[in-house]
């Protein structure tokens, strides 16, 4: 068992989640800005 390996894998999962979430967050932010005018 290698804690660093586990940590690395967790970090990759977090990074993947952030990368997938970023476009959605940007879209929502843009939609809100447009809605506010």
Curated annotation (Swiss-Prot):
- Tagged with keyword Secreted: yes
Record-level GO cellular component terms:
extracellular region
Instruction: List Glycine amide occurrences by residue.
Output: 37
Against InterPro entries, the record matches this protein to: Cecropin (IPR000875)
Q: Which GO terms describe its biological process?
A: antibacterial humoral response; defense response to Gram-positive bacterium; innate immune response
Keyword Secreted listed: yes
Query: What does the sequence similarity comment in the record state about its family?
Result: Belongs to the cecropin family.
Identification of the protein by name: Bactericidin B-4
Q: What species is this protein from? A: Manduca sexta
